[in-house]
């Protein structure tokens, strides 16, 4: 899994011009599923995301997690995180998981995440518009295949 984690003040998502989801302070997650991803990747990612101390405490130090601040999460499926740009000018997305596996694992990821924080989602495979107000900005890339 490759996940872009963005700390936000607020975010919203629309599909086909209709509002689908919105959150206040919390995290926007752009979630890419790879062909070799398994349940252990989901569990690892959920643990990291929900406990990552990237929100400021009363002294201005990044010392609080999204759980600590009672924040929310907007989770957006993002197969383009597996783009291969080595050849030519058009990215290839063959490094992403097939849609059926990716959809299943994305749903499982969101269900597991929702055990710890409120989660809003987009619609898997849809063309979506995401609006957000970055906070910091703080943007982190989590790759479950690179745990060292």
Swiss-Prot record:
Gene3D superfamilies from the UniProt entry: D-tyrosyl-tRNA(Tyr) deacylase (3.50.80.10)
Keyword Hydrolase among UniProt keywords: yes
Claim: Lyase is one of the keywords in the record: no
E.C. number: 3.1.1.96
Main location: cytoplasm
Motif Gly-cisPro motif, important for rejection of L-amino acids: where in chain: 136-137
Pfam hit, one: Tyr_Deacylase
Subcellular location: Cytoplasm
Reaction catalysed by this enzyme: glycyl-tRNA(Ala) + H2O = tRNA(Ala) + glycine + H(+); a D-aminoacyl-tRNA + H2O = a tRNA + a D-alpha-amino acid + H(+)
GO molecular function: D-tyrosyl-tRNA(Tyr) deacylase activity; Gly-tRNA(Ala) deacylase activity; Ser(Gly)-tRNA(Ala) hydrolase activity; tRNA binding
InterPro entries for the chain: Daa-tRNA_deacyls_DTD (IPR003732), DTD-like_sf (IPR023509)
Gene Ontology BP, a term: D-amino acid catabolic process
GO cellular component, one term: cytoplasm
Keywords: Cytoplasm, Hydrolase, RNA-binding, tRNA-binding
Domain note: A Gly-cisPro motif from one monomer fits into the active site of the other monomer to allow specific chiral rejection of L-amino acids.
Matches recorded under PANTHER family: D-AMINOACYL-TRNA DEACYLASE 1, D-TYROSYL-TRNA TYR DEACYLASE
Sequence similarity: Belongs to the DTD family.
Subunit description: Homodimer.
Function text: An aminoacyl-tRNA editing enzyme that deacylates mischarged D-aminoacyl-tRNAs. Also deacylates mischarged glycyl-tRNA(Ala), protecting cells against glycine mischarging by AlaRS. Acts via tRNA-based rather than protein-based catalysis; rejects L-amino acids rather than detecting D-amino acids in the active site. By recycling D-aminoacyl-tRNA to D-amino acids and free tRNA molecules, this enzyme counteracts the toxicity associated with the formation of D-aminoacyl-tRNA entities in vivo and helps enforce protein L-homochirality.
Protein name: D-aminoacyl-tRNA deacylase
């Amino acid at each position: 899994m490759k996940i872009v984690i963005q700390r936000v003040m607020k975010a919203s998502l629309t599909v086909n011009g209709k509002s689908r989801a919105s959150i206040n302070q919390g995290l926007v997650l752009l979630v890419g599923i790879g062909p070799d991803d398994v349940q252990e990747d989901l569990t690892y990612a959920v643990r990291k995301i929900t406990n990552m101390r990237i929100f400021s405490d009363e002294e201005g130090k990044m010392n609080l997690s999204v759980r600590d601040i009672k924040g929310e999460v907007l989770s957006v499926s993002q197969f383009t995180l597996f783009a291969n740009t080595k050849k030519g000018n058009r990215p290839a997305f063959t490094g992403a998981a097939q849609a059926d596996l990716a959809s299943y694992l994305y749903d499982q990821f969101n269900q597991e995440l929702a055990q710890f924080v409120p989660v809003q989602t987009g619609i898997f495979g849809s063309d979506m518009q995401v609006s957000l107000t970055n906070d910091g900005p703080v943007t982190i890339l989590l790759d479950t295949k690179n745990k060292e």
